Swiss-Prot record:
Residue ranges occupied by any 4Fe-4S ferredoxin-type domain in the UniProt entry: 54-84, 95-124
InterPro entries: 4Fe4S_Fe-S-bd, 4Fe4S_Fe_S_CS, NADH_quinone_OxRdtase_chainI
Name of the molecule in the record: NADH-quinone oxidoreductase subunit I 1
Lineage, broadest ranks: Bacteria, Pseudomonadati, Pseudomonadota, Alphaproteobacteria, Hyphomicrobiales
Subunit architecture: NDH-1 is composed of 14 different subunits. Subunits NuoA, H, J, K, L, M, N constitute the membrane sector of the complex.
Cofactor requirements of the protein: [4Fe-4S] cluster
Source organism per UniProt: Rhizobium meliloti (strain 1021)
The enzyme's E.C. designation: 7.1.1.-
Length: 164
């Protein structure tokens, strides 16, 4: 009898409805937990591995010395390098540096293997394309990425350097 009366009182005063409404109102005035993605972007870790880039020295010369360590260590065999002839000062530079982004698994081994920090995976993660051919990066595209993202790349490398 008491259980039936208790249920009737709860139903009469809409106890569950009021409780749910109060809970909704409490969360309504809290800061939002989600971001409106295309317009708002969350923080990206300095160790984030995004679109590849080739870096230059401050004087404008490319950093890559054509040692081919990144090509050798790439587990997906996505990197192809052709070294040019030795220059008068004994150094080499690349004639061809291609990355097949379709094959790339973004493991970061190329960045870790590079002795001069020439190839890096930058902070850019928004590089969708309409055709598959646009995902074959040549040396010019990689150098352009490096020029575009150099400030962020240098900051990320500096922030991560104590842990290397």
């Amino acid at each position: 009898m008491m259980a039936g009366l208790s249920n009737a009182v709860s139903s009469l005063f809409l106890k569950e409805f009021v409780g749910a409404f109060l809970l909704s109102m409490r969360y309504f005035f809290r800061p939002k937990a989600t971001l409106n993605y295309p317009f708002e972007k969350g923080p990206v870790s300095p160790r984030f591995r995004g679109e590849h880039a080739l870096r230059r020295y401050p004087n404008g010369e490319e950093r890559c010395i054509a040692c081919k360590l990144c090509e050798a260590i790439c587990p997906a065999q996505a990197i192809t390098i052709e070294a040019g002839p030795r220059r008068n000062d004994g150094t080499r530079r690349t004639v061809r540096y291609d990355i097949d982004m379709v094959k790339c698994i973004y493991c970061g081994f190329c960045q870790e293997a590079c002795p001069v920090d020439a190839i890096v995976e930058g902070p850019n993660f928004e590089f969708s394309t309409e055709t598959r051919e646009e995902l074959y990066y040549d040396k010019e595209k990689l150098l352009a990425n490096g020029d575009r993202w150099e400030r962020e790349i240098a900051r990320n490398i500096a922030m991560d350097s104590p842990y290397r």
